[in-house]
Amino acid sequence: MFDIKRKTIEWGGKTLTLETGRMARQADGAVLATYGETMVLATAVFAKSPKPGQDFFPLTVNYQEKFYAAGKIPGSFPRREGAPSQKETLTSRLIDRPIRPLFVKGFKNEVQVICTVLAHDLENDPDIVAMVAASAALVLSGVPFMGPIAAARVGYVNGEYVLNPTLDEMKESAMDLVVAGTAEAVMMVESEIKELTEEQVLGGVTFAHKGMQPVIDAIIELAEHSAKEPFDFQPDDTDEIAAKVKDLIGGDLRAAYQITGKSERHAAIGAAKEKAMTAFAKSEANPEGYDANKLGGVFKEIEADIVRRSILETGKRIDGRTVDQVRPILGEVGVLPRAHGSALFTRGETQALCVTTLGTGDDEQLIDALEGKYFEKFMLHYNFPPFSVGETGRMGSPGRREVGHGKLAWRALRPMLPSYEEFPYTIRIVSEIFESNGSSSMATVCGSSLALMDAGVPLKKPVSGIAMGLILEKDGFAVLSDILGDEDHLGDMDFKVAGTADGITSLQMDIKIAGITEEIMKKALEQAKGGRDHILAEMNKAMTAPRAELGEFAPKIETIKIPVDKIREVIGSGGKVIREIVEKTGAKIDIGEDGTIKIAAAEQTKIDAAKEWIKSIASEPEVGQIYTGKVVKIVDFGAFVNFFGAKDGLVHVSQISNERVAKVSDVLTEGQQVKVKLLGFDDRGKTRLSMKVVDQETGEDLSKSNEKAEEPADA
């Protein structure tokens, strides 16, 4: 029934198996990849003709994690997988980015890649396995794909690079570096780094590229036995129409790209495009004209060629800057009066309002992952409204791009955050992109760093970020610092670097062409270092260090420790005691399993009240000490006084006063505040208190005064 083909190799100390022919046989390409005991099924299906009027390449990548893969049932109400999690969205992007540039130019048939995690051994992250499986499925499918690619994760433990470290090994690693590439070149880099140097990071990229070569060979060997016939696709010959369009509007485009303002430049480019469409597009007046979509593609190619040649020949860019020049920067802090921390970061025509909010343990985000449930204490949310680029558009839940940009900034900042023990707050940052003309994710890094310091978060060091670009031709290359949106679209590489003055904390790279050498990457990292240092200097004009105190409206948190055996008493039966403390003091209280209690409130008095209440429950009163209490019950033989948290004690009628008390209610009333001394405990453990040995006005211990009075005089 099955024509199963397998290829097995040893890779990174574990066995990688690629299998086809058993599962999902109706897909154009299907590969089951197994690494350790982690299994991912990748399928690739493509339409055999493009949709009419299609003017872009419709590639969709979906990565999905099934809870059964880890022997779990989803924790959601319907108990089934629902909307993609952040991890699924990010991994979908991770797979998409290196494969998209490798489809044959001009291919516009719909392609869908679906990667399904079938088993997770809780040691090997499925993301790398999914990237390998997706590449293999595409190669087998016959789609015009210039792969294969492979991917690898690199850790950095004790000064050594580690290929495909386990989840446990990653906890000790100073680097989480994911690299994807072909046999010849790196195509994509994604990372979170604990302040390493440019040389260490570049070494990790090189190590990963070398380490993935056996996987590329394995995919090729599998394809030799299992691949379908290549799909017959011939790109359109556009040389003739390209020459005509360039003759007509080449000069207009060159003039348009001399305009430094984005809006004015785009208007001039639009006019040039309209001129070409009017002259050459098929219409009733021009039935022999060219297809509008084809013309649009030709226009983009001419546009890119003009800009790229101009930069290489003159060293000047679209807005007049040199290749290593950063746009003017302005950082402002404290821009929102009630926010815990806020900053407005503007770089040229890119602007981000970043707002920090501090919360308590109640505000942590519960993540239900295959590896298990955990709480996230640091969140960064990036919003990109359509008005930021002067357009109308969809508003609603964040798209993949917003999730990805937010995660990039999150990775850049996280290594510089204080430990939870040092700063026991949940931190949420929101970045609102108000203007965008390139590098809004790096503006988010810079603005968020300022907003954290404005909130009083003890950031280890300020973090800045910069987006780099590349123009690569046969006769030379140019690395561009702080790229514009147009330079991003027309260039060959998007290279984002974030870090402190002492090292890199995050690197993301997407390469659109083959042939990016180690020399070019080294040059880009060196140039980025100069740009980051310049940006940090500009940020320092707004703020150089975190504020010494939290903002007026931020919650204050204090931590105390109680014996573990006292936790039950603090919580009370059914939570009765802790609810009463919260209700009456107005403080938020979080009790850890180890007896650590975090008390949070906007006002210090509320924290103090809750703290004293908890201490009174968790500690024991001392014999001989004087306490202020309240009469809670009067009986014939005395009065019960609440004197130490929830603890009551008996003041016997004989201990109320030095004078005879005939009737207790004649001397005391319920609710009356009194001062008592703890005499000790009777045989049954009941508390014995005394009022008569305490001065009810001053709280002085009269028994000690009497002892002093009875002491003999010195001889």
UniProtKB/Swiss-Prot annotation:
Gene Ontology terms: biological process: mRNA catabolic process; RNA processing
Q: Report the locations given in the UniProt record.
A: Cytoplasm
* Keyword Zinc attached: no
- What cofactor is needed? Mg(2+)
Q: Name one Pfam family in it.
A: PNPase
Task: Detail the disulphide connectivity of this chain as listed in its UniProt entry.
Answer: none
Q: What is this protein called?
A: Polyribonucleotide nucleotidyltransferase
**One Gene Ontology cellular component:** cytosol
Question: Which stretches of sequence are listed as region Disordered?
Answer: 692-715
Asked whether the UniProt record includes Acetylation among its keywords, one would answer no
Assigned protein family: Belongs to the polyribonucleotide nucleotidyltransferase family.
Q: Where is the signal peptide?
A: none
Ordered alphabetically, the record's keywords are: Cytoplasm, Magnesium, Metal-binding, Nucleotidyltransferase, RNA-binding, Transferase
Domain of life per record: Bacteria
For bias type Basic and acidic residues, the affected ranges are 701-715
Transmembrane domains' residue ranges: none
- Tell me which residues make up the KH domain: 555-614
Grouped into one coarse class, the protein's main location is: cytoplasm
Q: Which residues form the S1 motif domain?
A: 624-692
| Annotated binding of Mg(2+), by residue | 488, 494
